[in-house]
């Protein structure tokens, strides 16, 4: 659900923000959500897109509100111990929501919250049913056609694929020690069937409908302005300079690399595991 604000100021004219109804609140009528668990927080130091030499390696980053990093369990390696979902919480470091699990042995962990998971639900990592949303299992034990997320690339290394808000993959087939997965991009690839994945799609599927409404809200997120190349000088960009508005050459990055369709992915050994590329040839 989204709230569209009345245009009482220029900043609220286009503003559309989520109501975050899935998040857990301390009481029924409270607007505030529950506070994060302190034992699962780490201090986060901003690099603002600079490397160890101070050079900009990622443009358009800088400033933003202070944040704590939430320690999220992507491995889901606590086997055969049931856990109860204590709360669904906001995480400023990722697009999806996170869920706080209270395990039967007393340990607490954060996981990525799938769609439909709510406080009070039971989840666990095991080799047996139930095949419920939020439960984790090896690919070789999952029913074909399952909708999954947080998929490992190598057994025991933790989930690397399908972790952003609203995404999901589908288990298509199994053969020769590999599971065939259809990715959100349309790519079909094989993954070791001993890798783990979690049932369900990632939470917060309507995130792409969010409208910030003003530049200042982007600055709160640590996102700086993006300047067009044609508005620069020739020393700053291949599109810069000239008399009046004109592009005059092939679309390029600031470093002269052709863009708009050029494949930049390097060949890797894992190419043989890709059954169908996401791009149609």
Curated annotation (Swiss-Prot):
A Pfam family of this chain: Ribosomal_L2
Signal sequence extent: none
GO terms under biological process: cytoplasmic translation
Positions with biased composition (Basic and acidic residues): 236-246
Keywords of this entry: Ribonucleoprotein, Ribosomal protein, RNA-binding, rRNA-binding
Record-level GO cellular component terms: large ribosomal subunit
Gene Ontology molecular functions: rRNA binding; structural constituent of ribosome; transferase activity
Cystine pairings recorded for this chain: none
Region feature Disordered, mapped onto this chain: 43-63, 228-253
SUPFAM superfamilies in the record: Nucleic acid-binding proteins (SSF50249), Translation proteins SH3-like domain (SSF50104)
Gene3D superfamilies for this protein: 2.30.30.30, Nucleic acid-binding proteins, Ribosomal protein L2, domain 3
InterPro entries: NA-bd_OB-fold (IPR012340), Rib_uL2_dom2 (IPR014722), Ribosomal_uL2 (IPR002171), Ribosomal_uL2_bac/org-type (IPR005880), Ribosomal_uL2_C (IPR022669), Ribosomal_uL2_CS (IPR022671), Ribosomal_uL2_dom3 (IPR014726), Ribosomal_uL2_RNA-bd_dom (IPR022666)
Protein family per UniProt: Belongs to the universal ribosomal protein uL2 family.
PANTHER family tied to this protein: LARGE RIBOSOMAL SUBUNIT PROTEIN UL2M, RIBOSOMAL PROTEIN L2
Function: One of the primary rRNA binding proteins. Required for association of the 30S and 50S subunits to form the 70S ribosome, for tRNA binding and peptide bond formation. It has been suggested to have peptidyltransferase activity; this is somewhat controversial. Makes several contacts with the 16S rRNA in the 70S ribosome.
Assembly, per entry: Part of the 50S ribosomal subunit. Forms a bridge to the 30S subunit in the 70S ribosome.
Protein name per Swiss-Prot or TrEMBL: Large ribosomal subunit protein uL2
Species assigned in the record: Protochlamydia amoebophila (strain UWE25)
